[in-house]
Structure formats: C-alpha cells, structure tokens
Amino acid sequence: IRDRASFLFDYGRGLHKQQQFSKSNRILKEALQRSCDPMILNVIGKNYQQMGDCLSAEDWFIRSTHRLPGRIYPYYLLAKLYAEPSFRQPDKFEKMKRMVLTKEPKVHSTAIRQMREEIKKIQLIFVHIKKDE
C-alpha cells in the first residue's frame, strides 16, 4: 500500500507539473487515503491556487501546517498565496512571513534560505503597494 501511495503522489505531482491540475487533485486525493505525507496536501493546494480557487488552496495549505507544524514550506506557500494580487491579505501575509523568517528549521538548507529570501522580496513589494495607497 505504501508503494502505491508513493506512486500516486509521484503521478499526481507529475500531472501538476504538466498543468493538469484537476486530474492531479483526483489522483492526490486518492493518495491521501494511503498516506499522511503533508506534501500531498501542499501539491493539492498549489493545484487549487493555479486554478484560481484561492480559498480552497488556503484550506489545503492550512491542513498541511496542522499535519506537521514544524515544517516551514506550507507557511511559505500561505505567505505567497496571501501576496497574490487577486487574494491579497496583508495581515495574514505578515503572520505567515513571520513564521517563515523566524521558525527554526529542523535542518538548515538552501531551500529554507531561498524561501526566506523570496518572502523578503515579496515584503518589499507590499511596502511599495502600501506607500502607493
């Protein structure tokens, strides 16, 4: 069963990369029946975000934070979602930005550093938008 979950995740992620978001979600939701890997939740959320359903994306990313609260990645995904022009939520962005920048990672990595750098760049855009308002 575990191998099947891994296969379904890889297949669903491949469909995501091919921009087949609805089909990817169907496969990934099947994978959820066999695995509690939070990355499944993250990819489902990213699919919804790509389809323009930001509320569903938010729900799936939040579920991922609940599954493994120590992971920084879903907070990063939420911060980016809250920075989307069509879903802009500065207060929620600030909260997620703080999580990304201050949460102590289990392992320091290039990925963590890159996420933090990107969030800082997004923050600069928010500062400019606030000045223009």
Question: Positions of the model-derived regions?
Answer:
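Short coil turns that delineate tetratricopeptide repeat
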Residues: 2, 35-36, 69, 105
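Single-residue signature of alpha-solenoid repeat helices
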Residues: 24, 57, 92-93
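Structural motif corresponding to the intra-repeat A-B loop/turn of tetratricopeptide repeats
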Residues: 18, 51, 85-87
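Conserved structural position within tetratricopeptide repeats
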Residues: 29-33, 62-66, 98-102
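Terminal, low-structured helical/coil segments at or just beyond the last alpha-helical repeat
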Residues: 91-133
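TPR-repeat structural position
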Residues: 21, 54, 88-90
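Alpha-solenoid helical repeat scaffolds
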Residues: 6-10, 39-43, 73-77, 109-114
